[in-house]
């Protein structure tokens, strides 16, 4: 069949059906969302949980959510801006930070569901594949599916670092090693050591050493926050190891205590009370009377 030009006449516009709002805005992939939210009919009211990972310029967001008619409901959430509490004060958007955020989410969720002692995950971070083993004499492992949104699922992407952290934290997420750093597409082999190096930010440490030797000025500029906080290339791995232990020890969200009340800014005049309005009228009358007396005199 040859090319048929669409005739945009009255009948075309009369029958035209617009796409969903979030599709028009380019925010939601409904093809993927349908498959991530629709549950098997035999499971009745059991929701299908999703691990939502979103990246921004300054933050990494990890959420566990499920879909309802009125909208999605968030069960638990963790953010990379919480990591300074655990000793990670710099590099809050790199692969290692994504892993820590996923680990924090998993431990926080399991503690919320009182499954943290039953499913501890793995404490040996070797970068290799790990899957949670379910217990026969207790509740099953928490199962969810990775929701990447509109992000490109390239090998070594940070979204898979967050997923790996959640899996090591004790969540049951179907996955393979094909998208982790260290997977070679040509030989179809996976090098777990390369993945481990990314989890502990060895690639950043190596770049720090190279830049410090060859371009000291650029090193001072690019790693100014590392220098300010006294973080060296040799101490990065130890920093992340301590952070993993601290996250497992206390995954609870820290309550924000406001020490001082915010200063309210007002851009319009405050509304006068009845007594203030009457007093204002009296003042206007008095000033007007005074002007009349001055002109007569």
From Swiss-Prot:
Identify the GO cellular component terms for this protein.
Answer: cytosolic large ribosomal subunit; nucleus
Signal peptide bounds = none
Q: Does the keyword Transmembrane helix apply?
A: no
Q: Which domain of life is it from?
A: Eukaryota
Q: Which GO molecular function entries does the Swiss-Prot or TrEMBL record give?
A: 5S rRNA binding; structural constituent of ribosome
Q: Where in the cell is it found?
A: Cytoplasm; Nucleus
Q: Into which family does the record put it? A: Belongs to the universal ribosomal protein uL18 family.
Q: How does it assemble?
A: Component of the large ribosomal subunit (LSU).
Q: Which HAMAP family match?
A: Ribosomal_uL18_A
Question: What's the protein here called?
Answer: Large ribosomal subunit protein uL18
Q: Which organism is it from?
A: Lysiphlebus testaceipes (Greenbugs aphid parastoid)
The root-end lineage is: Eukaryota, Metazoa, Ecdysozoa, Arthropoda, Hexapoda
Gene that encodes it: RpL5
